[in-house]
Design a protein with these regions (language model features):
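SAM cofactor-binding core of SAM-dependent methyltransferases
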Residues: 1-244, 294
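Conserved acidic-Pro-Pro-aromatic motif
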Residues: 263-324
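Structural motif
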Residues: 162, 254-256, 287
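Residue-level preference for short coil/turn positions at secondary-structure junctions
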Residues: 157-159, 196, 250-253, 284
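Short internal loop-to-helix segment that lines adenine-nucleotide cofactor pockets
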Residues: 149-153, 227-278
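Extended hydrophobic secondary-structure segments that form protein cores and membrane-embedded regions
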Residues: 200-204, 257-259, 288-291
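Short, low-complexity, polar/charged sequence segments that are solvent-exposed and flexible
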Residues: 219-222, 247, 276-278, 309
Length: 324
């Protein structure tokens, strides 16, 4: 209770730096680069490490592994009882298409078939996402703190845990597609970690059956769920998600946002708005899930993979655990 933490800096791993520094070239040959033996070996080791992390809340007594050096890090500084502390927490590196590297590309003969997913579960793979509750962290000098499922720089006891799902569809799935990252996936993941949201806000542009919306909710979600069957807007009025966030969240809250509305111009405008100098919303977000729509056609004027790397890096540099 006597500690005060602030985000300090984002430091990409050498693996991420390798991709980012070569992205002008790599963005047109992602699959062939990922298939190189040096990339395959790192990919498998990092993927298996994330899968093991995902299964439980991170234990500060867990054994460090050399593969952890391939992860990027969010760095924090804290003051506890007038003493300064430095902390770092792992996050998945931005590599390949900024998603599970063993999806979206042809199968690599040297990779065991049991490491591949199929169909929608490959397209919507969540195996490469390292959320904060599962993420390894270190505090220097060591500090005996009671970690109540979330690191102290992300959440203060007594504050809120908020999920905002922009493009939510129904709670369980959109068109019965249970492979998607939807509200239920977040609910299940956090419930497994004994973390309960205090508030869930769901935006959906498509007109949904009101009765079904509420019937699909688990009993413990009903009282904390706000459903807004109106599309989000970039104008800073009542349907702007950043304005809503500013109204309901405080810096000590743990805020998770998913943005997936399948309207690239609006998504891009909202992201640009979030990065605006005068927009305080970016300092309220802890984890943000977003898949930027891009083109691999050299002649296209659409955004390229390089634009995704730049966007994700900027947001991570503001302290947001940005996931693709």
């Amino acid at each position: 209770n006597s500690c005060s933490w602030k985000f300090h800096e984002y430091i990409p791993s050498a693996w991420e730096t390798y991709w980012f520094s070569n992205i002008d070239k790599f963005q047109y040959e992602v699959c062939s680069i990922l298939a190189r033996s040096d990339q395959v070996n790192i990919t498998i080791d990092v993927l298996l490490r994330i899968i093991s992390f995902q299964k439980e809340i991170f234990d500060t007594n867990s054994q460090r592994m050399s593969i952890d050096n391939q992860f990027s890090k969010m760095h924090y500084r804290g003051i506890c009882s007038n003493k300064e502390y430095n902390a770092s927490q792992l996050i998945e590196p931005l590599v390949g298409l900024i998603r599970d590297p063993l999806t979206m590309c042809p199968h690599i003969p040297s990779v065991s078939s049991n490491l591949y997913l199929h169909g929608e579960f490959a397209l919507q793979s969540k195996r490469f996402l390292l959320l904060a509750p599962s993420s390894s962290f270190q505090i220097d000098p060591s500090l005996t703190i009671n970690i109540a499922s979330l690191a102290p720089w992300l959440y203060t006891s007594g504050s809120q845990k908020i999920l905002i799902d922009i493009g939510s569809s129904y709670f369980k799935s959109r068109n019965e597609n249970t492979a998607e990252i939807g509200t239920k996936w977040f609910y299940d993941y956090f419930k497994e970690k004994s973390i309960r949201f205090n508030r869930i806000i769901a935006y959906e542009y498509e007109k949904l059956e009101t009765r079904r919306v509420w019937d699909e909710l688990p009993d413990d979600v009903y009282s904390i769920y706000t459903f807004i069957n109106v599309g989000v807007e970039v104008e800073m009025e009542k349907f702007n998600p950043w304005k809503m966030l500013e109204a309901i969240a405080k810096p000590d809250d743990y805020v998770v946002i998913k943005l997936d509305i399948d309207k690239p111009p609006l998504e891009s405008a909202l992201m640009k708005q979030l990065l605006g100098k005068k927009n305080p919303a970016k300092y309220l977000i802890d984890e943000l899930f977003f898949e930027k729509h891009i083109s691999d056609n050299r002649k296209s004027k659409e955004d390229k993979l390089k634009d995704s790397y730049e966007l994700f890096t900027k947001l991570r540099q503001y302290g947001i655990r940005m996931h693709g």
